[in-house]
Amino acid sequence: MSPISQKGEAVCLSVRVQPRSSKSGVAGMYGEQLKICLKSAPVDNAANKECCELLAKALGVPRSSVSVMKGASSRSKVLKVEGVTPAAVREALVGMLGDEAEAGA
């Protein structure tokens, strides 16, 4: 199963976040989820904001196009990305992660 799915016009991305990491970035796959490390602590929505900003930058979409659909207070989240196709998200992930992303896609 892939961490990428489509819901209407938007793409949904299943992620697992690790707050309070030494650096922020996409770290690879965590089972069927994309693992994202964040410097921010999970306080006052800071980690969710950083997660959306990081993913928007990685996918080349505006920050307003990425939002938390499920799991706002959990490490496992579903992010909604508007204005991009599942194929474009998959291509961006393969560019960041290489073979590991292809195995999960």
UniProtKB/Swiss-Prot annotation:
Entry-linked SUPFAM superfamilies: YggU-like (SSF69786)
Matches recorded under InterPro entries: DUF167, YggU-like_sf
Domain of life: Bacteria
Pfam family, one: DUF167
Cellular-component GO terms for this entry: cytoplasm
Family: Belongs to the UPF0235 family.
Family matches, as NCBIfam families: DUF167 family protein
PANTHER family associated with the record: UPF0235 PROTEIN C15ORF40
Record-linked HAMAP family: UPF0235 (MF_00634)
Protein's recorded name: UPF0235 protein CT1832
Organism whose genome encodes this protein: Chlorobaculum tepidum (strain ATCC 49652 / DSM 12025 / NBRC 103806 / TLS)
Lineage: Bacteria, Pseudomonadati, Chlorobiota, Chlorobiia, Chlorobiales
